[in-house]
Amino acid sequence: MTILDSIILGAIEGFTEFLPISSTGHLIVASEFLGLEQNAINKAYEVIIQFSAILAVIFNYKDKFSIKKIDLWMKVFIAFLPLAIIGFIFSTQIKELFSLHVVAVMFIVGGVVFLIVEKFFINEDEKTIYEVEAISLKQSLIIGFAQIFALIPGTSRAGSTIIGALLVGLSRKASAEFSFLLAFPVMGAVTAYDLLKHYKDFSEANLIILGVGFVTSFVVAYLSIKLFLKFLEKFTFFFFGVYRIVFGVILLLFFN
């Protein structure tokens, strides 16, 4: 991996992690395009850029990381549990799903779901929840079950949680923000596990590349969160649905 590769992958991770378009899917495609192998060193790199994306959430939502918000974080934890349990039980089977074909198909499926939800299930005027603090434990759990679909490569963790949140009555902005906060325990757990698994793969030889990826991912993720919320003030998720379908079709045509 070169420094340019590190910048490209760091930017892709930072930009896509919190959007409903699957950061994992984009990283898999980008790695294939750049000719990068899925070896231990490159896996360690992915751990670093995921960790920096987590920090972007903390910096964007410093006011949420307070003892006064314990009720909110209890709901976030409830939403985290289904994915944690299912992911742990079926970890081996999930790893076997990683392929460009699966990613492409799930891009298309996710895009169609977004279009259907936007067309038939959302009327922003009827939404009753505009702040993440107002979400109930039951709604949190339902969102958590929706997040299970993110275990399939190409589905998108953000996409599945946002769809779940929209269907239980959150506004578009509140759905996105709850997805951001839910990323903290999910990505935190995954990153901690991967760090323990790959810590021996970190060496002085690739510290510069790791550092470049870390900074790039953090800066882009920080800006991406802000731009995404601005986007949702004027637009719907229709664009993301169309993008997912087009991207998935392109993958099927050119990588199969």
UniProtKB/Swiss-Prot annotation:
Protein origin, superkingdom: Bacteria
Any Pfam family the entry gives: BacA
GO biological process: cell wall organization; peptidoglycan biosynthetic process; regulation of cell shape; response to antibiotic
GO cellular component: plasma membrane
Gene Ontology molecular function terms on file: undecaprenyl-diphosphatase activity
Catalysed reactions, semicolon-separated: di-trans,octa-cis-undecaprenyl diphosphate + H2O = di-trans,octa-cis-undecaprenyl phosphate + phosphate + H(+)
Record localization: Cell inner membrane
Keyword tags: Antibiotic resistance, Cell inner membrane, Cell membrane, Cell shape, Cell wall biogenesis/degradation, Hydrolase, Membrane, Peptidoglycan synthesis, Transmembrane, Transmembrane helix
Transmembrane segments: 1-21, 39-59, 70-90, 97-117, 134-154, 176-196, 205-225, 235-255
Family: Belongs to the UppP family.
Anything else known: Bacitracin is thought to be involved in the inhibition of peptidoglycan synthesis by sequestering undecaprenyl diphosphate, thereby reducing the pool of lipid carrier available.
Known function: Catalyzes the dephosphorylation of undecaprenyl diphosphate (UPP). Confers resistance to bacitracin.
Record-given protein name: Undecaprenyl-diphosphatase
UniProt gene name: uppP
